[in-house]
Amino acid sequence: MIRSTTAKLGKRCATLRVRASPILRPLVATRCITNKADEVFTKLSDENDPKRDAFFNYSWGSWLVNDKQEKAKRVTKFSLEGLTDVLNEIYADSQQLAKTVKSNRIPAPNHKKNLIVTLPHNTMIKDLGTVNPNEKVRVIRMASIHEGKHHRIYKLDTNIDRSFVLRIPYALENGHVIESRLKSEVATMDFAHLKLGINVPKVYCYGVNALNPVRQPFVLEEFIEGKLLMRDWNPLVDDKKDSLPDDNLKSVVEQVSDLQSKLLSMQFNGIGSLYFSKDYERPGEPKKSVYDGESNPDLQGRWIIGPTAERVFWRKKSVLNKEALSKFLGPWSANEPLEVVKNTGLVEAENAKARLALKQADASPEAVDETTLSEQIVSFENLATVGPHLFDSGTTTIPNVKELLKPRLYHPDLDPMNIIVTAEGTPYLLDFEGSSVKPFILHNSPQFVAYDGPKIFDLQEDIPDYEKLVDSEKAQYEFMYKRTRNQFLWDSALNERNNKLISAVAPPVKLLRSPYIAAVERKSDDEYLLIDEALIQLAEVWEVFYKNGLVKDANYPLTFSKETLEKHANDLNAFHEKLISRPFAATQGWIPQDMFENLIKAGILVKESDSSYTVKTENLD
């Protein structure tokens, strides 16, 4: 009987096992919802067996609109035979490396003819172990352990008692975007481990398109056994009796802050994202050092700063071809720290223009109206206009502003959900997708602690007659207090580790970068309104900021008419009402699969003639 490694967690999962046979190798695929499992048998040699397809299909959720199309984008069918060949190839390489390379050397990445790239320093015998003579590496069991926003993760168990992780990105973007993302992510993980001393899963090899033996873009890496740090994170836990923060709460913040401190320890000579030198070659241009002072000859020239791979520059940009997109991606000089803000606005405006043109030509299936796209264009162009004026490198009002403007490594998923802690207590930072190099003053707080609501530092002192309030009101204030506390713990940890950078969390500095952060964190089409809101708030305080030396220009670069401000206020209120009144608006219509199926059974979700689903709120209890 096959048991799924994730069934006991109560989530949808899939496992697949290969049984050795002198004649054939049948595959046993297990899919389960909660604790129930079904077995499906298929021949390993039959790649076209439809029974196998279920193992590759997306299953962790459904969409109210365009469900079939969204799931089709997330199919991760790959060649099991090709994967087996790749595994045997890296083991063969390890034998050759043992004869030709000293174990303390760090060879350059090996770009192979079959379009996979191996990292030789991770594929030595000390890393992989050995295979018995005349034995081949075989995958004997596979489990789908995660279906994320951008990629799917499989665990591979082999006949040599070693497990691997296979990561396959969803085909949500154009091929050239996925290619750049993978190249940059692997290079950034390599840099984080070799140069910053951060524990990351060893990457053995990767392929950036479907022309390799796996027939999908992929990353093959080390499997890390342990527990997610998120298991120790309870953001709404009560303080201890002495009013000090809970020990587990503080421990999680400090562990994540330790990782951030290592990421921030290096100052770079440019702005963009990291790549291996061979992955970003510019003929005729002199190679620039990524950072100063490298003495290890194996690391000299290993990496280069290339176009940014930050998510805001590629997310939902499929209407822009490679040439159109590349104009906005950099890399940029360290002497132009605000170019990244300007180009964030420009690329979003260009994307909105292209989407609008398709909509006007009746050639777009998107469920977005022309008015929204037109107003997006104005918002993003306004951001591009304001961007270069946000910070003055010569100000003395912001302490250590020159340090804040220096490019440093930014990790968008610095989160307990992205950290595994081994049994020995060693934390590993997992997913580096979308990492970039940009001024620290433009880094936003990690989502697990970020809080921009009303600040409450002491319930008794900050809330008049707190003890007289009814329980429901107390609960609201307690929520605000705990969110304030968590953000304060994070800021305090930054101050302890990098006190020269603490000015970045000062309220005026946060307000100055807020339009940019709203653009970076935008998830839906309507959230351009949050960019507008931040730009309008800046307009209201710009004169005060100028008089106090925070900004260089006396006049705010934008003007807003009374009619514009009134329309914005109405639109913003309507947006918030939409979030409240329309279930699942905040997740863009995505619903976890177990909940989706239960809502259908309860008659709350009803399928319409166009295959979309409607929420029948009248059926809610």
UniProtKB/Swiss-Prot annotation:
Statement: the UniProt record of this protein carries the keyword Phosphoprotein: no
GO cellular component: mitochondrion
Transit peptide (residue range): 1-40
Subcellular location: Mitochondrion
InterPro entries: Kinase-like_dom_sf, Mito_inheritance_9
Alphabetical UniProt keywords: Mitochondrion, Transit peptide
Domain of life: Eukaryota
Family: Belongs to the AIM9 family.
Name the UniProt record assigns to this protein: Altered inheritance of mitochondria protein 9, mitochondrial
